[in-house]
Amino acid sequence: MGVHECPAWLWLLLSLVSLPLGLPVPGAPPRLICDSRVLERYLLEAKEAENVTMGCSESCSLNENITVPDTKVNFYAWKRMEVGQQAVEVWQGLALLSEAVLRGQAVLANSSQPFEPLQLHMDKAISGLRSITTLLRALGAQEAISLPDAASAAPLRTITADTFCKLFRVYSNFLRGKLKLYTGEACRRGDR
């Protein structure tokens, strides 16, 4: 073993420690989110969760209104935004959506008769949002929050969700809309 070589187990250990912290993993592709198959996997999971909740009634009520990001996109305004401004909007939306899904999980945990398939999809959504957050950090989206554009960004538009179906619909639409638009543009430009 030379002076600059590290054993394989050390790279693995560094990778396991770095991922949850959102740090770049040595030897890993730094722009994994630019691979369309990665985002498509999370889109499929979100759509499956939405479809499962369409069929349930009372067991899918949140019994409260949870604030979620508005997923409507004005494409004309979006295209005119700087990539940094888009990153701010996506990052804020992702943070709010993560809070909403965690709140939904808490509501489900306190339910007297939890709908079993719903718990599985809540867990997948939480895991997916954490992974997407890590991938966006690797793309440099978090750094945009500290840029001057972030201070002048319009406040995030929000709506409320009162059912798990609506919560998962917002999750699915957010991934298909703003997140996909932002990552597509950031990956094309090579912004980091």
Swiss-Prot record:
GO CC annotation terms, alphabetical: extracellular space
Residues carrying a glycan: 51, 65, 110, 152
Signal sequence extent: 1-27
Disulfide pattern: 34-187, 56-60
InterPro entries associated with the record: 4_helix_cytokine-like_core (IPR009079), EPO/TPO_CS (IPR019767), EPO_TPO (IPR001323), Erythroptn (IPR003013)
Keyword Transmembrane helix carried by entry: no
One protein family per Pfam: EPO_TPO
GO biological process: erythrocyte differentiation; erythrocyte maturation; erythropoietin-mediated signaling pathway; positive regulation of cell population proliferation; positive regulation of Ras protein signal transduction
GO molecular function, one term: protein kinase activator activity
Coiled-coil segments on the chain, per record: none
Expression sites (tissue/organ): Produced by kidney or liver of adult mammals and by liver of fetal or neonatal mammals.
Record carries keyword Aminoacyl-tRNA synthetase: no
Chief location: secreted
Localization, UniProt: Secreted
Keyword entries, A-Z: Disulfide bond, Erythrocyte maturation, Glycoprotein, Hormone, Secreted, Signal
Functional note: Hormone involved in the regulation of erythrocyte proliferation and differentiation and the maintenance of a physiological level of circulating erythrocyte mass. Binds to EPOR leading to EPOR dimerization and JAK2 activation thereby activating specific downstream effectors, including STAT1 and STAT3.
Family membership noted in the UniProt record: Belongs to the EPO/TPO family.
Name of the protein described by the UniProt record: Erythropoietin
Classification of source organism: Eukaryota, Metazoa, Chordata, Craniata, Vertebrata
Gene name as annotated: EPO
